[in-house]
Every structure is written in structure tokens, then in C-alpha cells.
């Protein structure tokens, strides 16, 4: 039996904890879960009720235990207790009956539901009422339960109670018998697989700690969904609390609103969340037209917001304005929020973390951190350093905070990634780190960091300069797909010219929609060649329009928010694709990779672009052997049976290499800018200067001969 605590109330509820420990010990060899303070129940206009213990297993079914500390058996108190038990029992039963996958027939379930009362301070069992006063009586009753159901049914039951079934439902796909082998049918099966939480996700979403919490994992581990459920849960349990949900990628806004709404409506039987006053979903910056965390914080603290035009004069504009805010308030601003939830936290400078901490009460700050999304940041974040400054040198120490609640976790690692099939994820990581490049570009700092992300270090020490072999843990990539059904998971096209690359992309998109039955919104196109992205998308739109395929270009000037539009293929930059995904992704213009193969920036872009693809990845570029380097590294990965087998280099040495390369690059850029300035002053074009240089070089070579 695995125990999970979702509330820190256990500290004062010793009798309940004692019962949990006794049940856990007696049934330690039985597969199942013991959940403390689960699920939260909200009836219309009534207070939230939470069962104290819920046990779920194949041989016990669902057992709910409600605890009351009454000292004396009084009829009035007992009647109130019985009513509470009845409300919980009815809620559990009706919630499960709403799920067609759990119904045996019109009136019964595939899993039994038993609700018990526990009054440890009384001396008499009320057996007829299933109310007991001792642990031994509870255990004796549980022993008599004779249940037999499947693990699938148990997991489905928990999913129904935790509101995971309110996740975005798989799209309606009209598929006939003749479509059973199409990509659309496979996608439908995969979407069904991931429509519930695993244990780590459940713990992350429903744990309510009185203090800070970090949730981290790979892209696709469900962090945004988890944070949205947490926001909805906080709003339900603490209706007067003001909850801030902030994020980095503007295109996520609609998705976040939709998820919080779905979860909250499911929890409260149809009520709408109060986005106006209590749940504030805001982008980090904001302005006069659009609310934002920084802008609103300034207004609330009597500070004039710094404009973007002014801020960009100081380098990193957003970092600058956040630092100025922290200095202006001396890290002690007005506490505007009861809880602050930060999504995509890896993309923010530490100054934004500090701004958020300064405007929330009691350090109720929860951040979701993608450990490899920002490939520059391969060293594990240290919260003490993240939150420390001259006003508070200590920062936030999660280890010390954890000691207050030893049965709970304030630093949760999500080991599983649901976004990509394993092959795509491994290709993305291999290219992102330069595993099979002639020089390693970056790596994780030690074995534990790899293991936290769902990998197994088969050989070697990742903190040293030595050969290491690393493989993906099967359980960490749970998308179950028959390999024979995704033989074309990754396809690559080297086009002779630009026009033929565009023709191929348009033809493949048309085939995916007409033959493979994918919906247009299942498909996204991301351009790696950002210099030519306008040209790519403009011409691709024309080709697709000729095939009656609509497009949604999130790079258009009039774009506001959202990544998907029903009936449209999405065209996106890498930046706006972050945090989003599509079943089939075309990463185009990849010929720019070869010349920048030693650049961390380019490797980061490739990793981000590739990991947007859930099942099918299409890669293209223009020019003969334009993808030679990329193909070489991918083939090396395949030859090594999709394991990482490489000479490791400690992260501090890799950083030194990168800094030296960056310095050389900066010198080259400075020279180039000087050359441009000189050409303008002298009235000589750069092309003419290069022509003169080439001619002079040839003349010098002749003299040498």
C-alpha cells in the first residue's frame, strides 16, 4: 500500500495518522493506495467536505473512512457525523456512476464503495452504522471485504474522484471501420491513454502545503495541467483566497483558462470560477491594455511601470524592470495574492521569482520548472540562490521547509513524459546536448539529475570526464504504441531547392488530412530558420490555400493569444510554440543547423521544436546534403540502439568551452558591425569589400607561388 498525504493537517491529527500507519503496515504486500484528505467535495453553496482517508485496491475496492474526535457519544453530534458520512458516501457513489467505464449496469458499479466512521475517543462500536472506535475494529471490518476488480478499474475510479476526467477531452473524430489503421485512430487511442493522472502528478496537483513548492520534470510531464488543477482546487477549498496564475508563453492563455474552468466546474457541479476577482490568470509583463503581473504590482504599490522602450535600453528588459521593482519595494511589497502559481518557470529570470515572492502572503509560491526545456539551464536550480538577494540573503530553503511537514513533499519530480513517443524524445535530447556531435555541447551535472528526468545511467559517472552510457527508463515514457504502427514516426526530406521543400511540406500536410484523417489542428509547422520564416510561411500559406487547407499563423501582427484554431494548421515560431504540442509537427528550414552545430542556442531551438511533436515528426531543409550533420547524429543514435553512449565532460568545463566560443562569436560580431559602419561612411558596399578581399587574396597566393 502506498500512502499519499495531500494536506498538512495530519500534524495535529495523530489518531488518523496512527490508523493510516496500521492499515499500511498490515496490508503492505497488497497493491493499492491510501490517500489522506481525498477527494475534496463541494456541494452548491455549502462548505467543502473532505474524507479523512480513502483506500483503493483491487481486493478492497474503494474504502472511505471519516474521522471524528468527539469525546462523548451525544445524539446530536452523532447525527451530524452520520449526515457527513452519508454526504460523502453519496458523492463517491454518484461521481463513479457518472463514468460509463465504471458502470456494471444501470444501477451498479464495477467496484465496491464502503464508507466507515472512526471515532477514536469513544469506547463503543456502532457496528450497525459502520462506525468504529478502535483501529482493530476497522482492520477486522476491512478483512471481511471480499472484492475483486482490475487495476484499470481502480485507477479509473481514482481519476474520476480527483477530477482528472475534466482534462481536455480527446477531439471528436468521425472514423469508420475503414479508418482503423489510420494515424487518426492511433492518435485517438493515445489520447485516451493519457486522460488520467499518475501518482506523481496527483501528488503535485492536490497537495496543499503552507509554504513554497517546486514541481519539476521534462517537457510533456503534465506540469501545466497539474498547475491548473491546483489553481481550481485552491479556489474551491479557499473561495476567499486570491490566486495568481502566471506564465511565459502568451499562446497558453486560452488553454489555461479552459483547463481551470473545466476542473472547477467538475469539482463544484457546474459552477464557474471567479476569474474577475479571485483567480487571476495573467502574463508576466502586462500593460495598459492587457493586465500583467509586473504592471499590476506596480500600480498596487504606487510605482510608475517602466515602458518596454525604456527597459530595453538596459539589456534584458524584463530582468531590468523586475529588479527595479524589487529594489523599489525592498523585497517587501503589498501582499496582493494568497497564492502565486508560476508556470514555465524555467523561462524566467530570478528577478521575476523575487517579484512574485514579494507580492504573495506567507511564501505561498508554487512554481513548475521544466528541467530541459531551457537547455542553457542544465544545472539543477538552487532555490536558495534563486530567491536570495541583498534584502534576504537566505532565500528559500526547500530542504529546511520540508522538515516542517516530513510526510509531504515540497519538491516533486515528475519522472514520466507523456508528450512524445520515446523515439522523438531521445532524438531531441541527443541533438539538444550534442551527444553524437564531434564535441559534447552540454550535459546534466550528475547521475541523479539524469535519473530525475527518467533516464538510467547504465555505466559511468556523469560528474566526471569519462565514458557514460545512458538509456531511457521504459516506465518514464508511458505512451504505449506498437512500433510497427509508427514506423514513419520521424521522416526527413532534403529538398534540392526552396520551392521543392515547400511543395513537399504542403503535399505531406494534405496527405495527413485526407488519407491519415488527422484534423488540421492536429498539425503544426515550426520554422527553425527564423531569418526566412516570413518567406516560408507566406509561400506555404499560398500552397495550402490552393489545396483548401486553412492556416493559423501565430506570427501575424494581429495575433493576440492561443496556439490552435479549429480547422486550421498552426504556423509558428519556436518561441511561440513553447509549452504547446501537436500530433504531427513539421520542423522546416533545418538546413541552418549544420553551420551552427556547436551553438547551444541552436541546439536549444532544435530540442524545443522537436519536442512539440507528440507522435509524428517531419524534418526538412533546402540544399544538397543540407541535413548531413543532423542525419549523422540521428543515425549514430540509431546505431547505438537509442542509448546515449558518449565521452562525458563535467558541466563546468562545458560552460568554459561555451564561454570561449561565445567570446569568439562576440568578437566576430563586433568586427562585422565595424565593417558595416565603415562601409556606410566610405560609401562602399560590403559585397564590394568582400570582392576586393577575394581578389587581393588570389593575387597574394600567386606571388607566394
Model-inferred region functions:
Residues 1-175:
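Accessory nucleic-acid engagement/destabilization modules that flank
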Residues 44, 74-83, 292-315, 378-390, ...:
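Short, flexible/disordered intra-domain loops and linkers
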Residues 57-97, 110, 126-136, 260-332, ...:
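Conserved P-loop NTPase-based nucleic-acid remodeling module centered on helicase motor cores
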Residues 102-106, 331, 514-518:
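Surface-exposed acidic, glycine-flexible loop patches that form ligand/cofactor-binding
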Residues 179-192, 315-327, 470-497:
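Alpha-helix-centered segments that form part of catalytic cores
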Residues 181, 185-207, 212-216, 281-284, ...:
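Conserved helicase NTPase motor core
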Residues 214-244, 248-273, 285-288, 339, ...:
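Conserved helicase motor core of SF1/SF2 NTP-dependent helicases
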Amino acid at each position: 500500500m502506498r500512502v499519499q498525504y495531500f494536506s498538512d493537517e495530519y500534524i495535529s491529527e495523530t489518531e488518523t495518522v496512527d490508523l493510516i500507519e496500521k492499515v499500511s503496515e498490515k496490508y503492505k504486500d497488497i497493491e493499492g493506495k491510501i490517500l489522506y484528505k481525498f477527494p475534496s467535495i463541494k456541494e452548491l453553496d455549502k462548505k467543502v467536505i473532505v474524507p479523512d482517508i480513502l483506500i483503493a485496491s483491487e481486493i478492497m475496492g474503494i474504502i472511505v473512512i471519516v474521522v471524528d474526535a468527539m469525546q462523548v457519544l451525544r445524539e446530536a453530534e452523532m447525527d451530524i457525523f452520520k449526515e457527513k458520512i452519508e454526504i460523502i458516501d453519496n458523492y463517491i457513489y454518484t461521481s463513479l456512476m457518472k463514468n460509463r467505464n465504471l458502470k456494471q449496469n444501470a444501477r451498479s458499479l464495477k467496484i465496491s464503495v464502503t464508507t466507515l466512521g472512526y471515532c477514536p475517543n469513544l469506547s463503543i462500536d456502532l457496528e450497525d452504522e459502520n462506525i468504529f472506535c478502535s483501529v482493530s475494529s476497522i482492520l477486522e471490518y476491512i478483512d471481511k471485504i471480499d472484492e475483486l476488480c482490475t487495476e484499470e478499474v481502480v485507477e479509473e475510479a481514482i481519476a474520476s474522484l480527483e477530477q482528472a476526467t475534466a482534462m481536455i477531452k480527446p477531439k471528436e473524430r468521425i472514423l469508420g471501420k475503414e479508418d482503423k489503421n489510420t494515424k487518426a485512430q492511433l492518435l485517438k487511442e493515445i489520447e485516451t491513454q493519457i486522460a488520467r493522472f499518475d501518482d506523481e502528478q496527483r501528488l503535485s496537483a492536490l497537495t496543499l502545503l503552507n509554504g513554497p513548492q517546486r514541481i519539476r520534470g521534462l517537457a510533456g510531464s503534465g506540469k501545466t495541467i497539474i498547475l491548473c488543477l491546483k489553481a481550481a482546487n485552491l479556489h474551491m477549498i479557499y473561495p476567499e483566497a486570491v490566486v495568481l496564475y502566471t506564465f511565459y508563453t502568451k499562446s497558453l492563455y486560452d488553454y489555461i483558462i479552459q483547463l481551470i474552468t473545466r476542473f472547477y466546474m467538475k469539482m463544484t457541479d457546474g459552477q464557474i470560477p471567479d476569474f474577475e476577482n479571485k483567480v487571476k490568470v495573467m502574463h508576466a509583463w502586462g500593460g495598459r491594455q492587457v493586465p500583467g503581473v509586473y504592471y499590476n504590482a506596480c500600480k498596487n504599490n504606487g510605482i510608475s511601470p517602466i515602458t518596454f522602450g525604456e527597459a530595453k535600453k538596459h539589456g534584458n528588459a524584463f530582468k531590468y524592470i523586475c529588479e527595479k521593482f524589487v529594489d523599489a519595494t525592498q523585497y517587501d511589497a503589498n501582499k496582493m495574492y494568497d497564492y502565486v502559481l508560476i508556470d514555465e518557470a524555467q523561462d524566467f529570470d530570478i528577478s521575476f521569482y523575487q517579484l512574485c515572492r514579494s507580492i504573495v502572503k506567507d511564501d505561498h509560491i508554487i512554481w513548475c520548472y521544466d528541467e530541459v526545456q531551457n537547455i542553457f539551464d542544465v544545472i539543477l536550480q538552487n532555490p536558495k540562490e534563486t530567491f536570495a538577494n541583498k534584502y534576504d540573503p537566505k532565500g528559500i530553503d526547500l530542504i529546511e521547509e520540508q522538515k516542517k511537514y516530513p510526510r509531504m513533499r515540497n519538491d516533486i519530480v515528475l519522472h514520466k513524459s507523456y508528450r512524445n513517443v520515446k523515439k522523438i524524445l531521445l532524438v531531441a535530447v541527443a541533438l539538444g546536448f550534442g551527444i553524437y556531435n564531434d564535441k559534447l555541447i552540454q550535459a546534466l551535472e550528475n547521475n541523479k539529475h539524469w535519473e530525475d528526468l527518467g533516464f538510467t545511467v547504465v555505466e559511468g559517472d556523469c560528474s566526471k570526464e569519462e565514458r557514460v552510457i545512458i538509456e531511457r527508463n521504459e516506465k518514464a515514457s508511458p505512451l504505449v504504441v506498437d512500433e510497427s504502427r509508427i514506423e514513419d514516426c520521424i521522416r526527413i526530406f532534403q529538398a534540392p531547392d526552396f520551392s521543392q521543400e515547400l511543395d513537399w511540406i504542403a503535399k505531406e500536410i494534405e496527405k495527413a488530412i485526407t488519407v491519415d484523417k488527422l484534423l488540421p489542428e492536429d498539425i503544426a509547422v515550426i520554422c527553425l530558420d527564423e531569418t526566412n520564416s516570413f518567406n516560408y510561411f507566406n509561400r506555404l500559406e499560398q500552397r495550402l490555400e490552393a489545396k483548401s487547407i486553412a492556416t493559423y499563423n501565430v506570427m501575424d501582427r494581429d495575433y493576440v493569444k492561443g496556439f490552435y484554431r479549429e480547422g486550421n494548421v498552426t504556423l509558428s515560431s519556436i518561441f511561440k510554440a513553447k509549452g504547446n504540442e501537436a500530433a504531427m509537427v513539421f520542423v522546416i528550414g533545418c538546413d541552418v543547423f549544420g553551420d551552427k552545430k556547436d551553438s547551444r542556442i541552436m541546439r536549444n531551438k532544435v530540442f524545443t521544436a522537436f519536442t512539440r511533436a507528440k507522435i509524428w515528426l517531419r524534418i526538412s531543409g533546402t540544399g544538397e546534403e543540407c541535413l548531413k550533420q543532423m542525419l549523422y547524429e540521428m543515425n549514430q543514435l540509431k546505431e547505438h540502439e537509442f542509448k546515449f553512449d558518449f565521452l562525458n565532460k563535467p558541466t563546468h568545463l562545458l560552460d568554459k568551452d561555451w564561454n570561449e566560443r561565445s567570446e569568439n562569436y562576440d568578437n566576430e560580431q563586433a568586427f562585422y558591425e565595424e565593417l558595416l559602419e565603415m562601409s556606410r561612411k566610405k560609401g562602399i558596399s560590403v559585397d564590394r569589400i568582400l570582392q576586393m578581399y577575394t581578389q587581393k587574396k588570389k593575387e597574394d597566393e600567386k606571388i607566394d607561388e
